[in-house]
């Protein structure tokens, strides 16, 4: 499908596969969280934040499933919870307490300089161009809001956080549910037809479209190839350069 002459008041961007390479998330961020989970939990075990995360992790249905694989009734300690964190990450389960913990672990990595957020080279220019045109830019990702901010604040293109006016994660709802996008429109106080959602996942695009949003699919290097049906159902771009002419209605 060709790119229409688009107008929008808000550009809502996904992160993984849209502003940031999938490989950065899966080959850098996830392994970093797996490798550093136990150390972080040991360091912060007595803090209120970690206690809450540990409690929330144990309430997940997957926890009983994981514990049953260990053979005995294990003590709930940093080693056990770190093992469960690795279990969840290996299964790519996007559950909120895991995302919260990952965000805290990554925060230490960014602060130490061990991590820098990947963004595609066209992202910073597009953000600047859209802001100059008077558009707001918001982020909706399955990663926690804290983790989102870290990627853009400590990005390889510099601090991009000032360009972003709002952040949404799974607290607002899952990304393949129409209600999530309706709620985002309400929070942004803008009609859904004035929101352009950019993502690499057709099922997310379908949910956003059902809520009344404009949608465009990204076919970045390393993304899952789009089918002919998906390409005929949605406008598709390879980068943000084609969207520099985006303007307000």
UniProtKB/Swiss-Prot annotation:
Binds 1 Mg(2+) ion per subunit. It is an enzyme of class 3 (hydrolase). Substrate binds at residues 141-142, 175. Mg(2+) binds at residues 14, 16, 200. It holds the Pfam family Hydrolase. It comes from the Eukaryota. One of its GO terms (biological process) is L-methionine salvage from methylthioadenosine. Its EC number is 3.1.3.77. It catalyses: 5-methylsulfanyl-2,3-dioxopentyl phosphate + H2O = 1,2-dihydroxy-5-(methylsulfanyl)pent-1-en-3-one + phosphate. Keywords: Amino-acid biosynthesis, Cytoplasm, Hydrolase, Magnesium, Metal-binding, Methionine biosynthesis, Nucleus. It is found in: Cytoplasm; Nucleus. HAMAP family: Salvage_MtnC (MF_01681), Salvage_MtnC_euk (MF_03117). Monomer. This is Enolase-phosphatase E1. It comes from Drosophila virilis (Fruit fly).
